[in-house]
From Swiss-Prot:
The gene is rsgA. Belongs to the TRAFAC class YlqF/YawG GTPase family. RsgA subfamily. GTP binds at N159, K160, I161, D162, G213, Q214, S215, G216, V217, G218, K219, S220, S221. This is Small ribosomal subunit biogenesis GTPase RsgA. Its cofactor is Zn(2+). It is found in: Cytoplasm. Residues 112-273 form the CP-type G domain. Keywords: Cytoplasm, GTP-binding, Hydrolase, Metal-binding, Nucleotide-binding, Ribosome biogenesis, RNA-binding, rRNA-binding, Zinc.
Amino acid sequence: MTKKKKLTHGQVRRVRNNQHKKLKQEESIVWDEALLGSAQPGLVITRFGQHADIEDPVTGEIHRCNLRRGIESLVSGDNVLWRPGAETLAGISGVVEAVEARSSVLVRPDYYDGLKPVAANVDQMVIVSSVLPELSLNIIDRYLIASETLGIAPLIVLNKIDLLSPELREQYSTWLNDYRAIGYDVLYVSKKTGEGIADLEVKLRDRTNVFVGQSGVGKSSLVNALLPELEEDVEEGAISETSGLGQHTTTAARLYHIPSGGDLIDSPGVREFGLWHLETDDVTKAYVEFRPYLGGCKFRDCKHGDDPGCLLREAVSKGEISALRFDNYHRIVQSMTENKANRQYSRSKKPICKSKLLASLEHLLTEGAIFSNISRPSPLYWNVNHG
């Protein structure tokens, strides 16, 4: 296979300028009401900028539509009312008029924009982890907090298990059995060997599922395994040799129909899942194994640390609560506190140019400067200090 020639900086700049002009042209389209049909239901497949791909539930056809002004929060999985155009103008064939009420919405905190919707009307959150990049139980716990808070059923999937030796697989099973013990489903899968794919299909059937997890854990590879009939495979990411972190592939969440039943939404990978928008009590209640003990501590304001008479700590000492989960709980609460303090401090400072900041971060990530000095004594604690 011939390697693609790398574009020069000038070529990249011209491509971006052409794309920008095209988007401006599409956004400037004003439909004559006489050219629009009657409103009908549709399903959002993906959204980018002021446009969205809407599926007609009757024909299954996909229509690229403009969004009416005032429609801002639109994500994959949303049910909408849209009006088809009598003709296609600059690739646009309709207009989204309204968004129907959601049964659920997965959100994640954005440092600049508050809570950012990721997917709507989700029945199940598929938390994809893998053995490469290293397994982080802390990130699994963060997603479980999100799922419990939002009322979305979680499913834990450990991917790339073909890379595990028998000894390591036994160790990973020991860690993940703590989650099975408190009622969470855990699957071991491998696209390479096919192990667990059939079981995963059964778990996804008749549900709208959102795939979440770090970049590089293989979410897109699982999408390809579940959707073998895709004309073009979803791009699969590699692992940075410098940082050991996954490189982002999916740039916008997209909904797919699974041939064996159910839908799935492949979301952009995140390296950590911030929870600073939640209160400590929300996090505490999201730990399902804590609930029988809450309210029984000696002190009403017990922080569940070294406080005397703490029922949670007593339960940990008796083996009734996982020590690893309990330790992650304190790490998460601490990181939330630190991140909230940093956020409040940054608001009091002069605003920083977002584009310049992102460009600097992109450069650092490319050069492997960020995270390159993180000590990784155990996969249990990797990437745990981000709120």
